Amino acid sequence: MRGNTHQIPLQETSLEIWDSKYRLKSKDGAPIDGSIDETYQRVARALAAQEREPDTWYAPFLWALRNGAIPAGRITSNAGAFEHKPATSTINCTVSGTIEDSMDDILGKVHEAGLTLKAGCGIGYDFSTLRPRGAFVSGAGAYTSGPLSFMDIYDKMCFTVSSAGGRRGAQMGTMDIRHPDVVEFIQAKREDGRLRQFNLSLLITEEFVSAVKEDAPWQLIFPYTAKEVEQDGIALDDPARLVWADWPNKEGVVINELGQVACKVYKTLPARKLWNVIMTSTYDYAEPGFILIDKVNQMNNNWFCEEIRATNPCGEQPLPPYGACLLGSVNLTTFVRDPFTEQAAFDWPAFRKVVAIFTRMLDNVVEINQLPLAKQREEITAKRRHGMGFLGLGSTLTMLRIKYGSAASVAFTEQVSQELAMTGWQESLRLAKEKGPAPIMEQEFEVTGKMLRLRPEMAADGIKLGDKVKGKVLHARYSRYMQQVAEVDPALVAELAEVGGRFTHHSSIAPTGTISLSLANNASNGIEPSFAHHYSRNVIKPGKKSKESVDVYSFELLAYRELVNPAAMPYAEEEGSRLPDYFITADDITPTGHVDIQAAAQRWIDSSISKTANVPTDFPFEQFKDIYLYASDSGLKGCTTFRFNPAAFQGVLVKEKDLENTSYEFTLEDGTVITARGNEEIEYDGELHTAANLYDALKEGYYGKF
């Protein structure tokens, strides 16, 4: 049997989401894209128009889109559509400029963020730069309310600004594990309705992980101002009052020759005590996430000109201040030949061909970025960063009869990530020769003490403090990631050091939730296994305050029913309707199995990976804590877990049995209390909702106070 999965009809939900999110329509709602293929034609035409010979490239671009290349939602929605919606961007990911510790700059960055969200982009911020609650503000002659109170302003702004194309605004807030207000940050979202427009992540350092392992004390610190040091007569060599640390604040502070900032010690506590506060919150509330920030910066290709402190809202793009990145994913299920048979195989030549063409397509998106801020446009034009990843890994493994989490699945994940990376960097060199390298490659950088501290091998190569070195040399020869690429193809990286690459970054694995469900017919999200093979998914519908629950099937189940057994269903009791044992779901995989898959991909992904390790509700807390240490030891750049806990929040993907077994209480205005099962329908404010989704919308503040 040689099954053609291209011909499996799209399920109704997939078509509905394409229609509501990606289909181009006139201002009165009349469809302009007549079909999904016409959406592909629009995108291919817009990207080919950036070439010297558009007609030459239109056909290959359209072929790639028909064969597994899926640009991210902003590109699919907006490329070729600027005549109809001129204020929208093709860029999914941005990070705010550094928020300086002044009222003027805090409110200025709110304004910039509002414009960014209005253009349809997600945005991340580092709030570690704001002095802690209770610190004295000499200019105001008063004490500050701290970063959390200012985060509330950003939250309300995001809630108010309707993000373009009917999307809810997406924000990431990060805080350094050394910040004095870190515990307040960890626990902030326990208050109903607070910071609901944010994902929250901690910037976890290697020093903190070591302190936890060694049961050592941990200092909470924040920079002194230069004025404080002078007025209070603080000795710069007094370890009791001052420590030197890498910190993003660079204005009005004291900096040493290594680029470190003089910081005040606010409090010292056992590292394990702080660790337990984090773990308790993550176990019960699935937040904050972890960003292993030292690993992010060590492996950053632009290590010589960037200090990364924040990510986009889903965490797959760590970016510098004003950084921006566009995304795209390759649907791996497209390349499975003879699925579900002993002859099942992955078509590597076809995969490499799609990746090569798609790399050129994504590079062209830089020319039509439509970012709202000049500094964002300067960043993306100078570095030409993009993040190509894949989706459908779990579905693909099932079609190849490989269990997700097994040794074979880890090996396949590493191979597919390496093939994607190597093809991308080969294309980077070809494009640089044809069109020129990214401008930053030809820029000269003065060697600083910090650069020599971070890369001692530069001194061994005879490079001295104050020397001028081109970006292409610092990128290819001294980036830790590019040296991994050199282990496979040293000639390629040597030539990149001579010519410069077309872009500084090529790969990133996004969650792909909506494009997987729509354009990939519910192939598994990103690097994930399928959540379940038949389940309810909570989707945002324009104009509705609660999410709407829709019934969906996994792509691999649809394919199996189409190609092998039309009667097959999960949990079937009849022998003739059962699925093979390699049909597994997120709950069947151990937390360490999730981490192993992520680690296999991370070696070859030059940005980061958005991934969630699903944890059973009854998973022991002591074992849960070990997942994060295991993730750190495995070389990950970030880690997120999800444990079903309906009292705290409602996930995007929900199993029917979980809803049936969960009760929700609602108190009416007259004091009457009603109880409803999670899947029961309730009419409220003129709309029908499931009890679970209504409870979640009320809790998040979409109807005012909870």
Located regions from the model:
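Structural signal for hydrophobic packing residues in well-ordered secondary-structure cores
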Residues: 1, 22, 43-51, 62-69, ...
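Catalytic alpha/beta core of large soluble enzyme barrels
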Residues: 14, 316-318, 362-367, 437, ...
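Long, charged, mostly alpha-helical binding arms that flank functional sites
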Residues: 324-388, 398, 572-578
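Secondary-structure capping and boundary motifs in well-ordered enzyme cores
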Residues: 10, 35-36, 83-87, 99-102, ...
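Glycine-rich phosphate/pyrophosphate-binding loops
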Residues: 119-131, 168-173, 400-406, 608-611, ...
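Core structural elements
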Residues: 10-19, 63-83, 177-178, 359-368, ...
